[in-house]
């Protein structure tokens, strides 16, 4: 963890992916992020996959470096404590609905310069999740083999909840923008970030929306080919699949040389009356002929030999790996400074943990911090932020309004 945000405290009341991601990124830059959950855990506390000890690996990784407070959020007193924590701290990240007890108006009534950041489904208040937003975005119907029939082929969903992670990152940025504004003007802000707007807005920002409207039709499916440029997966003689991309003149020249295709490319150019060195357009328009030529050349090489040739020519390429292979690849994990030693994870399972994605040369990134046990910091936070005595906290524990650490609670997967 860096300490760039060490003077910032944020209350997080959230679940699933986008909202915890926003808090995680702030925490990895040094912010004190206090996640408040119901005493039995939030909706994501038992998110699959669970270890034999009943601990969620998803929850454990999305909540690293945070503090945990457990309140009875179904009771009036528990909700009041949560509101008081948010107002006292001044910053809130949540995905609870605006009509909930954490409505911005209620918080602003207690603190005029309150900043609340709320992740929503759709801009009109309808519920949504990454998977349903993705369905509406158009992307699943761009994916799939190019020979699929456009009228009958199924959509292809992506495994990665990309809209959740993009939304979480955008929310961390929006929170810091609101803080910067408050620092200059003294004004708080209500910030709403609909997941659906992130998806359709990304479609627009990428130029894809303008493209569809200009065409008056949908983009064709391309299989694993790169849209608008030269790139696709190929297979070596020994059966290794790898991806190549050539978007610059240097990348294109290097790829042609590495594959030994100078003469073949020259012959194809003469046949078609084009120059592939002129840019993306001729390479993309004649991709089928180029793909056949490159695959024929790949059939003559084992992957190790071809990879050495591509590396020598400065090509952009990578071998396909399974996720398990990626997790065990030294270049990606063990020898990568992004990862640090396993902290004391609540699950008891030791595995590499990430530092901040942003690397600040000259600054100590520190070792990754563990996720908390549920309620691990309840007592400390209530005492520090709200000034409650140990006796008052004890009475709240006895009443079931708050809960302390579940470290020694028996859980079943």
Predicted regions and their residues:
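Terminal low-complexity tails and localization/encapsulation signals of metabolic enzymes
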Residues: 1-9, 235-237, 274, 308, ...
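Glycine-rich beta-alpha junction loops
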Residues: 40, 121-124, 195-200, 238-240, ...
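Oxidoreductase and adenylate-handling cofactor-binding alpha/beta cores
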Residues: 140, 168-188, 205-212, 256-268
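Mid-domain beta-loop-alpha active-site segment that forms a flexible
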Residues: 159-176, 195-205, 247, 251
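Active-site Gly/Thr loop motif
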Residues: 213-231
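Aromatic-enriched alpha-helical interface/lid elements that frame and gate functional surfaces
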Residues: 230-313, 317
């Amino acid at each position: 963890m860096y300490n760039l945000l060490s003077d910032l405290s944020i209350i997080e009341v959230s679940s699933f992916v986008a909202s915890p991601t926003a808090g995680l990124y702030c925490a990895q830059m040094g912010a004190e992020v206090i996640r408040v959950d119901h005493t039995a855990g939030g909706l994501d506390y038992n998110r699959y996959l669970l270890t034999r000890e009943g601990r969620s690996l998803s929850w454990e990784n999305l909540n690293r470096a945070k503090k945990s407070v457990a309140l009875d959020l179904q009771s009036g007193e528990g909700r009041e404590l949560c509101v008081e924590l948010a107002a006292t701290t001044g910053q809130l990240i949540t995905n609870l609905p605006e009509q909930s007890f954490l409505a911005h108006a209620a918080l602003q009534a207690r603190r005029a310069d309150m900043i609340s950041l709320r992740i929503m489904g759709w801009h009109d208040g309808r519920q949504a999740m990454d998977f349903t937003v993705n369905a509406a975005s158009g992307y699943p119907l761009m994916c799939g083999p190019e020979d699929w029939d456009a009228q009958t082929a199924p959509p292809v969903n992506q495994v990665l909840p990309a809209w959740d992670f993009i939304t979480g990152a955008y929310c961390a940025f929006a929170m810091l923008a609101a803080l910067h504004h408050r620092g200059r003007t003294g004004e708080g802000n209500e910030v709403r970030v609909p997941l659906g707007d992130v998806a359709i807005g990304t479609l627009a920002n990428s130029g894809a929306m303008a493209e569809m409207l200009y065409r008056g039709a949908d983009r064709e499916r391309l299989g694993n080919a790169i849209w608008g440029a030269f790139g696709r997966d190929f297979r070596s003689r020994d059966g290794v699949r790898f991806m190549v991309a050539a978007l610059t003149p240097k990348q294109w020249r290097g790829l042609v040389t590495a594959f030994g295709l100078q003469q073949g490319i020259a012959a194809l150019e003469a046949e078609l009356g084009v120059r592939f060195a002129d840019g993306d357009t001729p390479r993309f328009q004649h991709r089928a002929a180029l793909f056949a030529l490159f695959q024929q050349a790949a059939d003559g090489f084992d992957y190790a030999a071809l990879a050495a040739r591509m590396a020598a020519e400065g090509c952009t390429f990578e071998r396909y790996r399974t996720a398990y292979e990626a997790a065990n690849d030294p270049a990606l994990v063990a020898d990568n400074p992004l990862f640090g030693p396993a902290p004391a994870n609540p699950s008891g399972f030791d595995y590499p943990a990430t530092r901040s994605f942003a690397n600040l040369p000259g600054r100590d990134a520190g070792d990754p911090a563990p996720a908390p046990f549920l309620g691990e910091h309840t007592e400390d936070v209530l005492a520090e932020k709200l000034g409650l005595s140990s006796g008052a906290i004890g009475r709240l524990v006895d009443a079931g309004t708050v809960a302390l650490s579940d470290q020694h609670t028996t859980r079943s997967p």
